[in-house]
A protein has these predicted regions:
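Jelly-roll (double-stranded beta-helix
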Residues: 1-238
């Protein structure tokens, strides 16, 4: 369960309520307004601007396209995604791993599913604290075992030295829970949290939250309890 102080808020956004676009090669769900999906009440949450739940068919993907002034974090759920950009970077990020692109003054990149199976991923966009800066890209493998608490994948916060760096006062975290296990998170005053169970079901404030639902949170102390084995992804931002 997520238990909150009285001053905090919890807004559950069921998967079926999310924006939806099926392009054949790409089946996407949008937690916030994106491309052809527009909802004035879902333009972002704090500095979190985009959370796309993408399923990409084998041997397809996104051809070269530009980005600027955005921190783009990709969490691969199943399969793998292959990246190539105008800086000369290239790499393959597998399930459970994370890649980060700081678009800065501008970068072109392509992302393809070169596998023989569907790739599922979360792509998360966070608004940087300051515009501009030199663009960059990086990827990292993270531990997959349950019960080790939160792992900080990407962060611009002091002390998160093992995380991939981003240029925002934000962090992207993950955790794996066994059924019946709980995990706590303290969301600072004035901060915004957005939680998605990538897999499994959790209980939030005595309400059930299913896999791929979104949960918008305000500052408070929270406890998350898994009703079944679960994989969690959380963004903490201003």
């Amino acid at each position: 369960m997520i238990e909150a102080q009285a001053t905090s808020t919890i807004d559950i956004r069921p998967f079926e309520s999310l924006g939806h676009a099926n392009h054949g090669w790409l089946n996407a769900r949008h937690h916030f307004s994106f491309a052809g999906y527009g909802d004035p009440s879902r333009m972002g949450w704090g500095a979190l601007r985009v959370w796309n739940d993408d399923r990409i068919a084998p041997q397809t993907g996104f051809p070269p396209h530009p980005h600027a002034d955005m921190e783009i974090i990709t969490y691969v759920r199943t399969g793998a995604i292959s990246h190539k950009d105008s800086l000369g970077n290239s790499g393959r990020t597998e399930a459970g791993d994370v890649q980060v692109m700081s678009a800065g003054t501008g970068i072109q990149h392509a992302e393809y599913n070169m596998e023989q199976e569907e790739t599922a991923l979360f792509q998360i966009w966070i608004i940087p604290d300051v515009r501009g800066g030199e663009p960059s890209w990086g990827t990292r493998r993270f531990p997959e075992q349950a019960g080790d608490g939160w792992t900080v994948f990407a962060s611009g916060m002091d002390g998160d030295v093992e995380a991939l760096p981003i240029r925002a006062s934000a962090r992207v975290l993950g955790a794996r829970l066994k059924a019946g296990d709980s995990i706590d998170y303290a969301l600072g005053e004035g901060r915004h949290g957005y939680l998605v169970p990538a897999t499994g079901t959790v209980e939030i404030d005595n309400r059930r939250v299913n896999a791929r639902d979104g949960v918008a949170l305000r500052g408070g102390d929270y406890r998350i309890t898994a009703l079944e084995d679960a994989e969690l992804v959380l963004v903490d931002s201003l």
